[in-house]
Amino acid sequence: MAEPNFAPGLEGVAATQSSISNIDGAAGLLSYRGFAIADLAAHSSFEEVALLLLDGVLPGAADLERFDHGLRAHRQVKYNVREIMKFMPVTGHPMDMLHCAVASLGMFYPQQELSDAERGNTLHLDAMAMRIIARMPTIVAMWEQMRFGNDPISPRPDLSHAANFLYMLSGREPDPAHTKILDSCLILHAEHTINASTFSVLVTGSTLTNPYHVIGGAIGTLAGPLHGGANQKVVEMLEEISSVQQVGAYLDRKMANKEKIWGFGHRIYKTRDPRAVILKGMMEDMASHGNLRHSSLFEIAIEVERQATERLGAQGIHANVDFYSGVLYHEMGIKADLFTPIFAMARSAGWLAHWREQLADNRIFRPTQVYTGEQDRRYVPVAQRT
């Protein structure tokens, strides 16, 4: 029997066929369902992009209104889930809370697997996806209140997806400029082809388990430091630098020790990350109009971006989406440990689109392995072992 090919991390292995998103890493291009990400960020909304990812076409007015109404109507989280959250340690990371809370939603799902009829019912799958997308921001915002001893703030059906989340975080009317920033960030983080968390969606979904298990697994995967969390690391890095005057020495030390500079470079993009280009322009525009608080950390970030680009730009290493989203979230007053849960809120749309695509032509994942262990060993009773 021929030895199977071994590709560590499945790098370069096409594990699926997909029509959801596409990346041209050499040209620095990203598209959702064939639409350039720059056009979607400029003209669309997260609600519309989520439905585009799920259904494959730009929705008409009636379909978009139906989906948007459904999102607003399903923001409330069952009281039992809130009770579960009460017993979680407030010192835990919000991603651990989100993983647990989303998994608990599956307790209210009547079946542990999808029937043939359900898998073929587009409206049914849309409804399940809509409920998850609607409730994840509520869970994150509830936790932000509960971990500081406050009662959760009820969602408002008169607000958009992004605006409602900002309202539930603070209890204040959301700033329109901040709402636009968050909406754009949600669009830019909504989908990015097959990465670790999306691959976990395919593997878990291929078993025909319910979508709460599928998304719970993806959240757990995203929580790993090699996948999600980079924008939180960006803010921690900027706080460590502490002043504009220290930027050069910090970068020199990191480069001399061949250590990672958070928020720079990308495994796929060989030029500028198109999402980063959009967010940088937005950051500059918002700052010039006084819509960001312009903290000392913001000034450090601008200098890090300038000096790091001078040192690394010729190698094709530029600031990525995590660098700018981390800075923008910080300037909006959002705590750093909420950055990855917000990433998960956005990516839920892409995850669920891939879940649906997997169900449409399902085959359970069963890769092989290259065995490297010993053979034909003889069992020795414990009394005779030396």
UniProtKB/Swiss-Prot annotation:
Which BP terms does GO give this entry?
Answer: carbohydrate metabolic process; tricarboxylic acid cycle
Q: CDD domains this protein is in?
A: citrate_synt_like_1_1
What's one Pfam family the UniProt record gives for this protein?
A: Citrate_synt
Q: List the active site.
A: 266, 322
Keywords of the record, alphabetical order, are:
Transferase, Tricarboxylic acid cycle
Q: Which GO terms describe its molecular function?
A: citrate (Si)-synthase activity
Write out the pathway annotation from the protein's UniProt entry.
Answer: Carbohydrate metabolism; tricarboxylic acid cycle; isocitrate from oxaloacetate: step 1/2
Keyword Cytoplasm annotated: no
Might you give the EC number(s) for this enzyme? 2.3.3.16
* One GO CC term, this protein: cytosol
- Transferase listed as a keyword: yes
Reactions accelerated catalytically: oxaloacetate + acetyl-CoA + H2O = citrate + CoA + H(+)
Q: Which PROSITE patterns match?
A: CITRATE_SYNTHASE
Superkingdom is Bacteria
Q: Which InterPro entries match?
A: 2-MeCitrate/Citrate_synth_II (IPR011278), Citrate_synth-like_lrg_a-sub (IPR016142), Citrate_synth-like_sm_a-sub (IPR016143), Citrate_synthase (IPR002020), Citrate_synthase_AS (IPR019810), Citrate_synthase_bac-typ (IPR024176), Citrate_synthase_sf (IPR036969)
Membrane spanning stretches:
none
- Return the similarity comment: Belongs to the citrate synthase family.
Misc note: Citrate synthase is found in nearly all cells capable of oxidative metabolism.
The protein here is known as: Citrate synthase
* The species this protein was found in: Acidithiobacillus ferridurans
Protein encoded by which gene: gltA
